[in-house]
Every structure is written in C-alpha cells, then in structure tokens.
Amino acid sequence: MPLLHADTAVLDRWLWLSKRLPPASGQKMLLDVGCGSGAFTIGAALRGYNALGLSWDERNQNVAIERARMCNAKTAEFQIQDIRDLSKREDLFGKFDVAICCEAIEHIIDDEKLMRDIAKCLTPGGKLLLTTPNYHLKPIDPAHEGPFPTVEDGGHVRKGYTSEGLLRLCDEAGLKPESISYCTGFVSQKITHLHFATRKIHSIFAWLVVNPFRIFPPLFDDVVTRWLQYPHYSICLEASKPN
C-alpha cells in the first residue's frame, strides 16, 4: 500500500477518509481531485470504488499507475488534468458518488471556481470529502508560513482555511455542509516534522527512522492535542450535493 511510505499526516488523512468511505460493491464512482501520486485513489479502489485520480503532474501520474499495478487496484484510473480546468471536463459532470480533494485547494487561487466545478461532477446526493491546512496551524514547513505567491507556482497560495471559510465555499458552490472536523494533531505533526528532516538525508533512512513511531498518533494524538490545546494541521469538510 502506498501509504506505508507516506508521512503520518498523509496517514491521518486516509484514516479520516476511510471512516467516510464504507466498502463499496464496485458500483460507486469516486473522483480524486488533485490526486498527487495516487495513494488515496488506490486506497478507495481497494475499498471497492471505481476511482479516478486527476493531477496535472505527468510524473506523479506515472508513479500512481505503477503503484496501482503493484497493489492490484484494478478499478483505479489516472488522468493528467489541470484541476483549474475541471469545468472543461463535461464528460465528468454528474458522474461521481464521491469526490475527495485532499490538501489541493490551498494551491488554487480561484478556490470558489474549483468548488463549483467539483460540485458539478457529483451526482445528486453525492458527497465531497475535503481536507486542507487549518488557518490556525503552526507550520511544519517554513514554506507554509508565507509570504504566499500571487501566482500558482505549485506551492500554497494561502495559509489555510477557517471553518467559516469552508462553509462560505460550500454555500457558493451549492453544497450542503454536513460536518467540519480536524486531523493531524501535536504528536503526528512532530513525527511528520521528523520525517521531513530525515528525508533530507535519504528517503529510505527517513522511512526507517519514522516507521516505528507510526503506531503513536492513532493512540495518543487526540488526547495529547486536546491537553496541549494545540492546533491541528488539517481542517476536514464533509459536504453533500442536494438531491
């Protein structure tokens, strides 16, 4: 599974997603908007979804295709697509039961348009699962402290979102918000920081150092984060398209 090589923040997002992605019979369609190297697309496919991952990065898509092959995720498909141009993909409109968008919207200047375009791709009653940096986070990466560019160069164009900001985006896209929650607390953030630091030496070394610590966030992260009143890294939105 590609998630074995991911940092703990990515694992946190998958745990959040998987609780909201019950096993499917193969009839459910899922769209991964800004899929990166395909970890969540593959994870959804292995849970029985017909999953389509979109990303502009050809290298990442090639990695995703190879990972899907290795994982025998036969219902995972990947297409090269700039998500800023999702409105041009009329073939995807009204097709998907679920759309996921994890840590992607903060890279897009016209976030309102992206939300509207995702909503167009959902079936009536379809669900959006979205994660993005929490505006109140304490940055793990110095690049997340700003200043932020006014052009889309692949990095973050804003620090993150508040719950009010996500609710406003839902309203403008015609989506009904169902819940807002958070993931990646203090323990997970510190392990992720260790992963980033050791990865500068070598990716395999980073994996060997960090892997023994992966058991701790599911056990202690929520308790420690509440006790310290520490801001979570990601804010998570669950919304649906009205029937």
What are these regions (language model features)?
Residues 103-107:
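A short His-aromatic
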Residues 131-157, 168:
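Short, glycine-/aromatic-enriched active-site segment of Class I SAM-dependent methyltransferases
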Residues 158-174:
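Short alpha-helix
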